[in-house]
Design a protein with these regions (language model features):
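Aromatic/hydrophobic beta-strand junction motif of beta-rich domains
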Residues: 43-56
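Short, compositionally biased P/S/T/A/G/V-rich stretches that sit at domain boundaries
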Residues: 23-43, 514
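Substrate-binding cleft and catalytic face of glycoside hydrolase catalytic domains
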Residues: 168-345, 381-382, 478-483
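Aromatic-rich peripheral "rim/lid" segments of glycoside hydrolase catalytic domains that contact
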Residues: 298, 443-542
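Noncatalytic carbohydrate-binding groove/subsite architecture in carbohydrate-active enzymes
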Residues: 280, 310-445
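Boundary/entry segment of secreted carbohydrate-active catalytic domains
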Residues: 124-176
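Short, acidic/polar
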Residues: 152-164, 269-275, 353-361, 452-460
Length: 542
């Protein structure tokens, strides 16, 4: 029996005690003012150094909360360190053996609890993540030099579109649990993480090398969309990666409920962050964590959960990704992925995007800030209908608009530029429109023209809004797997009449941001019913 199989048995047993509600009332926790405070957590090469102020009296301890633990009685009573002085400084080894793995404690949270004389430990501070970590590498700066991008980029016969259109950013999907195996397979190579051996697929890694190098060699910023497939490439790893409450959908929330699952997820993130930060194999500049989590029942599934439990799981996943990525690239951003449902849920299974964003701010205020940003998907209300400027009736310029689409991008621009939403109160967070496009219901001339008109509107608006850092038009080309939509800039690659042919929207996107923009865009003013592009802009109202 190999180590992963043995640990899997232990981990499955631990799942029996995992509760979705996770003990602590998250909303109360984020809002509460505690009597104690963990002031800072600094991680050196070999030590974790924690400073704080505990309440007066006796019986207080420093509690380490690992990523697979909750802020409940079980999570808070492990790894207690007595605090003798009101103002304290404690130093602990960075690496320990626990749960069958060699664990890097730079990934933990640290909280003050009162344990003596209590039936269960009582939380007396917010739990704080590491503020500073000694880097493994300092990546070379790679600036974003323009707003125009493509979504779902890959290497094919049209790969040079990024040069033809002067593309400055792309997204690529990375199916994390398709990359590695629990035991050696033909064409795999070994990498150890946390004392556990994993074997990575050489063919899949070679493709990532080639596509990421192609982009970085041309100065193109790449954001990796991290996805957990419902089934792993190695069946043995399916229950390791897949969340125990996942009951369907297209992708799963990662399983971080036990040491083995945490370690496997961290192992693949560490591999990618390490390999694609040096520049030798290309770069991953930013990370988009999972897909459209406000409608997770379809796109990042962990079953039907209370909002607080789902949000807490997603926050942990974002934190883990960032805390690993920053070891190798301190300029990286970790972006949350959201639909156009600004203040409404998709249905009873969906959550409002603005609420999730504001709760990310609350987590940062409570547990220490990190470089998180927003990957917004401002599709039209009806993804099939390109005429969003007419038919998006639930889309207004109010801060409380139901939907956020190309029509009213001013709303999220205003939100991201508020100082209270800045990273550490100083730096505007990165905002990408990372998946969005207008549809051509058919390849008729009228439908293609309407699609192109929508692309003109989108570019004119976003290029003028300073809070929006970039857009990745999705899809680059029409895709048979997208529910009949034709939102690409090119036709289906297997189209019978003109396979992969450029649509009018392709030429709009090529002209965007160039000296040909006004000439190419001008005919579409009449299509939309405008006299001038300035008419599309509106003030945001309360």
């Amino acid at each position: 029996m190999n180590k992963i199989k043995a640990l899997l048995i232990i981990s499955l047993a631990l799942l029996l005690v995992w509760l979705p509600a996770q003990g602590t009332d998250i909303n109360e926790y984020l809002s509460k003012e505690y009597p104690g405070q963990v002031v800072s957590v600094k991680v050196t090469k070999n030590k974790v150094k924690i400073k704080g102020i505990r309440p007066s009296g006796k019986g207080y301890y420093l509690s380490e909360v690992t990523p697979w633990e909750a802020l409940d009685a079980q999570g808070l009573q492990d790894n207690l360190i007595r605090l003798c002085f009101k103002k304290f400084r404690r130093s602990v080894p960075r690496k320990i053996e626990t749960g069958g793995i060699v664990y890097d404690r730079s990934l933990s949270r640290w909280a003050i609890v009162k344990a003596d004389g209590e039936d269960v430990p009582v939380l007396c501070s917010h739990a704080r993540y590491a503020d500073e970590v000694a880097p493994v590498r300092v990546a070379t700066e790679m600036p974003l030099t323009g707003k125009k991008g493509l979504g779902g980029y890959r290497l094919n016969k049209f790969a040079d579109d990024i040069e033809k259109m002067d593309i400055r950013s792309v997204t690529i999907n990375i199916h994390l649990n398709s990359l590695l195996y629990a035991s050696e397979k033909p064409g795999s190579f070994l990498r150890e993480y946390g004392g556990v051996k994993y074997w990575f697929d050489s063919t899949k890694v070679d493709y990532l090398d080639r596509v990421l190098s192609y982009c970085s060699d041309r100065g193109v910023i790449t954001s990796a969309i991290t996805l957990i497939d419902l089934k792993s490439a190695d069946p043995e790893l399916t229950p390791v990666f897949r969340h125990p409450d996942c009951d369907g959908g297209f992708y799963s929330m990662p399983n971080m409920t036990n040491p083995l699952s945490f370690n496997a997820y961290a192992a693949v993130l560490d591999f990618l962050a390490d390999r694609y930060s040096s520049g030798e194999h290309g770069r991953i500049n930013n990370w988009i964590i999972h897909n459209e989590v406000d409608y997770g029942i379809d796109w990042t599934n962990m079953g039907k959960q209370p909002y607080e439990a789902y949000m807490d799981a997603y926050e942990k996943s974002m934190r883990l990704n960032y805390n690993i990525a920053r070891l190798y690239d301190q300029q990286t951003w970790t972006l949350g992925s959201y639909t156009h449902n600004w203040t409404v849920g998709e249905n009873e299974n969906g959550f409002p995007v603005r609420k999730m964003l504001e709760d990310h701010v609350r987590y940062s205020n409570a547990e220490g800030d990190f470089r998180w940003g927003v990957a917004q998907h401002p599709y039209p209300q009806d993804l099939n209908d390109p005429l969003f400027w007419i038919h998006d009736t639930g889309t207004t310029w109010s801060k409380d608009t139901k939907y956020l689409t190309f029509k009213n991008l001013e709303v999220i621009d205003e939100w991201i530029r508020r100082p209270e939403h800045f990273y550490k109160g100083e730096t505007k967070r990165l905002l990408f429109l990372s998946e969005n496009g207008t549809n051509s219901p058919s390849y008729s001339e009228e439908d293609l023209v309407n699609q192109a008109a929508g692309a003109c509107w989108a570019w004119k608006k976003l290029s003028a809004l300073p809070g929006i850092d970039g857009v990745q038009w999705h899809a680059w080309m029409d895709n048979r797997g997208e529910f009949g939509l034709k939102i690409g800039l090119r036709r289906f690659p297997d189209d019978e009449e003109a396979p992969g042919a450029e649509k009018p929207s392709w030429h709009v996107w090529q002209a965007a941001g160039t000296d040909k923009e006004d000439e190419v865009f001008a005919p579409y003013l009449k299509v939309i019913g405008l006299g001038d592009w300035s008419e599309i802009f509106h003030e945001v109202t309360d």
